[in-house]
Amino acid sequence: MNINDILKKLINKSDLEIDEAEELAKAIIRGEVPEILVSAILVALRMKGESKNEIVGFARAMRELAIKIDVPNAIDTAGTGGDGLGTVNVSTASAILLSLINPVAKHGNRAVSGKSGSADVLEALGYNIIVPPERAKELVHKTNFVFLFAQYYHPAMKNVANVRKTLGIRTIFNILGPLTNPANAKYQLMGVFSKDHLDLLSKSAYELDFNKVILVHGEPGIDEVSPIGKTFMKIVSKRGIEEVKFDVTDFGISSIPIDKLIVNSAEDSAIKIVRAFLGKDEHVAEFIKINTAVALFALDKVSDFKEGYEYAKYLIENSVNKLNEIISLNGDLTKLKTIMVKSSG
């Protein structure tokens, strides 16, 4: 593969084929391409607009080069991030609820644009985020939950970390996280930072052997189910791609004030989650339940979103014990108790 020819093709706004993109991504991730050319390629892709084939090719490369574990029938609740609003880590909270009834392989990272990434909030709760593969399988067996820290499970990505940081712009790598779960989770609730990317990412997901994925973008511009209004969805399954629009009031609840969901730090997010689990923060609890409801539908545990919401109400009642179990087997209960004390006021 001639990297300069690939660059010229991208500059001329021609899309790469899947095999070309996969080969290119492997070369970049392995550190075989000079940084100046990596920068040029990532910018050219962004300016052209990443195609479905390019996303699929890059995702396949990242999956192949990742440290892998086998978690049958797992669900993930990862999102692209990048919405910039800094809301509570609802996908992580939902993952904890889902682990009451299904294996969860939560793939995530530290915050990039927000105040708290999934790794940050789990650490604040006392969780040990570095989990080797054998230990990960053990934790899933015992608790139905494991966190797969992206930096640990995609070690080759360190070869592009400097370029990405220097560029300081969104690149194709920013949208690959939810598509590259090291456990190859077959079910997913995938938050998308932009409504415009729903179509592209749903078509990409369709090519990547998921059983069922629900991609969501919610008003007022978040990569979650909307707490205030409409959620735009793409439901991807073996049968194809279905487009759905759903309003928060369709759950049978009122809209949730967005300002009640904003956090300033990982600890702040952890406290809000625990308060919701304890029944002390109704707004955050509702936000968790509506996102969990859609994830339950992705798992085919319920027949519609409203039924999912009713199921989520039951799950959140059992969330504190589940959180204690998760931290006790892989973390620091002292840190969790500190958060519990701060949450009890």
Swiss-Prot record:
Pathways involved: Amino-acid biosynthesis; L-tryptophan biosynthesis; L-tryptophan from chorismate: step 2/5
Cofactor: Mg(2+)
Residues at which 5-phospho-alpha-D-ribose 1-diphosphate binds: 79, 82-83, 87, 89-92, 106-114, 118
Cofactor remark from the record: Binds 2 magnesium ions per monomer.
UniProt: Mg(2+) 1 binding residues: S91, E224
A Pfam match: Glycos_trans_3N
Binding site for anthranilate 1: G79, N109
Recorded superkingdom: Archaea
Any one of the GO BP annotations: L-tryptophan biosynthetic process
Binding site for Mg(2+) 2: D223, E224
Positions that bind anthranilate 2: R164
Family membership: Belongs to the anthranilate phosphoribosyltransferase family.
Protein name, UniProt field: Anthranilate phosphoribosyltransferase
Upper classification of the organism: Archaea, Thermoproteota, Thermoprotei, Sulfolobales, Sulfolobaceae
